[in-house]
Amino acid sequence: MKKLLTGALTLMLTASVSAQTKLWTLQECIDYAMQHNITLQRARLQLQSAKEDVSQSKAALLPSLNASTSHNLGYRPWQDSGITTVTNGTVNTKVDKTSYNGSYGLNASWTVWNGNRNRNQVKLNRLTEEQAELEIQETANSIQEKIAQLYVQILYLKEAVKVNEASLETSRKNEERGREMVEVGKMSKADLAQLSAQRSNDEYNIVSAQAQVENYKLQLKQLLEILGDEAFDVATPDAAMTTNEMALADVPALMSVYEQALATRPEIQSAEMAVKSSDVSIDIAKAGRMPTVSLQASASASTNSLANNDWSDQMKSNFNTGAGVSVSVPIFDQRQTKTNVNKARIQRESNLLALQDQQKQLYQTIENYWLDATTNQQKFRAAMATVESEQQSYDLLQEKFNVGLTNIVELMAGKDNLLVAKQNQLQSKYMTILNLQMLKFYSRPTPSSSL
């Protein structure tokens, strides 16, 4: 998904290279986050854990084999009889107070059938694995949306700083012109003080906007898991025409975006997967009513130091093998199976409601993006005309002010109106750009989880 958000924003990401601070493009921010974001890394670990569960459930279909052995020493201090042997007519009696015995065994078992519980467990774990993959995609999507929102907000505030700087430059010129007029007696010091106050207010607006830029940069750095002491800045567009054209792009149809999102968004697919998992869980619960058939086999041998024959002969003579089959038929389990089946069905209904809720939330999210894109685009069109009109009006006021044909109140009001118009234009432009990109983001296919 990391290329989707940058498709229409590509032209915004060209910037000159700074010798001191790396300028991060949107694509670079997304790529870095996909590798370093801790939440995403934890989601990948959950996928690895789910894969292990699948492997374990598959192995449960196979027989189990165990080897065992035990060795014991015994001591009988008052032993008075032992092993008697006759050698060359001589009777010898050996009394062993210490004895040793050992046993060796192999045991195998295999559950042949248990109502398909084991096979259904494999299915359930595979569905859980797929959900873990979708969780990675969902987490990645959420991170990319946040990155795009912060990135566009930084671009907006950077341009707002430039607008305020231009306003400050105008205020300084007006203040300088006011001083000249005071010197020749064409303006009172009270009017000059108003011009100075307007200049101070513009300086404050610049500081405030710059502080907001730094705040959003910090939020973006934290999202990317970049250390706080590292210099960080984002790439800015070279030309205003680029962002203007992007803000005036066609808004896609609401239902078209929603239908495509229903088919591709990982949160919807995950909710659908949860319903499928519920169906398998019901089958697993029903297996509690079925018999369990198992096969067993064993081989064992034992030795004792007090025996007359040697170890190898004992192993042969004491070697035993056996095999058998066992069948367990549930008759009454204190309603445990019925309870499990009912609870599994209740969980399925809950998952169906969760799916409906996800679909509703998805529609509401897309609807909000669509409405914001449509509304802000209309505002942007109107704001462009307003800025042009206010600029012409202010230029005329400034010309009149320079020759003493208008008062300070009208000049300041005209300047304030122009500043407000430019700020409204900026805000509506970048809000339109952001919401248009979100609509495109939601309407495009989701790639594989190998991010």
Where are these regions (language model features)?
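A short glycine-centered flexible hinge/capping loop motif at secondary-structure junctions
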Residues: 182-186, 401-405, 442
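Small/polar, glycine/serine/threonine/aspartate-rich low-complexity segments that form flexible
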Residues: 21, 68-110, 238-249, 283, ...
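Bacterial Sec-pathway N-terminal export signals of envelope proteins
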Residues: 19-66, 70, 235-276, 447-448
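Bacterial Sec-dependent N-terminal signal peptides
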Residues: 1-26, 447-451
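Sec/SRP-type N-terminal targeting helices
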Residues: 41-45, 58-59, 98, 112-140, ...
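Acidic, low-complexity, intrinsically disordered peripheral segments
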Residues: 6, 75, 220, 228, ...
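Membrane-embedded beta-strand positions in outer-membrane beta-barrel channels/transporters
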Residues: 66, 105-107, 151, 217, ...
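Periplasmic alpha-helical coiled-coil/stalk elements that build and connect Gram-negative outer-membrane
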Residues: 52, 142-260, 372, 376, ...
